[in-house]
Each structure stands twice: as C-alpha cells, then as structure tokens.
C-alpha cells in the first residue's frame, strides 16, 4: 500500500538505520576530514550513482544533493540553462510532494521563472506556449502509480525537459 507523501511501509535493516538514517553526518553539512571516512563516502556515492543509472537507464546520475526538493529545483535550473526558447514557464504536477513544489517555487522566482502547478492531464493539454520543463512525481504524492509516458510526451511537445521525482523502490 502506498500511503502517499513519500512515506511507504518498508523494512529498513538495522545496520542502514543506525549507520545512515540516524547518522547526522548524512543529513547535515558536516564534512568528514578523515581520509578513510571521506573515501568510504565517495565509494558509497559512486555506488548510489551506478544504482540510479541501472534503475533508470540514464547515461549519467548525480548523488550530491540531500533532498528531493533541492534536486528538483536544481533540475529546473539546469533545464532553464539548456532552454533554447524564450520560455520562462515551468510546469509542476500537482501530484508532486508539497515540499518539492514549495522549493521549486522559491528557487524559480530569482531565476525569473513562472511556475504553473496543475494537473498534468489537463494543464499540459491547455498550454499554448513552450515550457522550460515539466516535473512529475512517481509514485504521486497520494501514493498513486501512473504511467508518466503520456505526460512526458506532452512536455516534449512543448519543447520542455521532462523531470521525474521518483521513489527508488518504486523503480525496482
């Protein structure tokens, strides 16, 4: 059962719980100075990137961001820099997590981007202009599983980059 908002009933092994989830070094700005710890962290990040490439089929992946909202906002910024048109419109599915939408809206304003939050089925059909990008959530914030292929095609028809915020276990 996907209860939504990014929280799903999964079993977390104790060793992962204790050494990663409960270790403040992973979710604060703390930078380890011991070379052995730094090397271990680099190896873990490389393995994470490889797992993302394997799950998604993408050519490259990044592992330097700590939360989904920041990663989505960075993807919007990258899409904006790659954008060939004069568009400044970013589409965000209303099915994205609220915290992700908030971070995107906050980061888009200083870049001069307008954010349209809406239903991907209706809003993308009604758009008449190009967009910088479109952001979709998988599974959705209410826990629903939906094939994003049609929405991705609509985003591409508007010359936008498709960005997906995914739960890794849903891709496995």
Regions found by a protein language model. Give the residues of each.
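Short, well-ordered beta-to-alpha junction loops that form the rim of enzyme active sites
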Residues: 7, 65, 95
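Short, hydrophobic/aromatic alpha-helical segments in well-folded domains
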Residues: 48-51, 61, 75, 103
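Extended, polar/acidic
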Residues: 1-13, 56, 98-103, 110-111, ...
């Amino acid at each position: 059962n996907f209860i939504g908002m990014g929280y799903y009933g999964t079993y977390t092994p104790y060793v992962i719980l204790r050494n990663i989830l409960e270790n403040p070094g992973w979710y604060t700005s703390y930078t380890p100075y011991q070379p052995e710890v730094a090397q271990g962290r680099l190896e873990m990040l490389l393995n994470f990137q490889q797992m993302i490439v394997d799950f998604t089929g993408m050519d490259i992946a990044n592992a330097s961001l700590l939360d989904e909202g920041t990663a989505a906002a960075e993807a919007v910024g990258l899409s904006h820099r790659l954008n060939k048109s004069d568009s400044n419109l970013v589409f965000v599915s209303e099915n994205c997590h609220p915290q992700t939408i908030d971070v995107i809206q906050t980061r888009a304003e200083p870049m001069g981007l307008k954010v349209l939050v809406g239903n991907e089925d209706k809003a993308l059909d009604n758009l008449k202009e190009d967009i910088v990008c479109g952001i979709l959530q998988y599974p959705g914030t209410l826990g629903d599983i939906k094939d994003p292929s049609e929405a991705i095609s609509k985003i591409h028809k508007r010359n936008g980059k498709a960005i997906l915020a995914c739960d890794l276990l849903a891709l496995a």
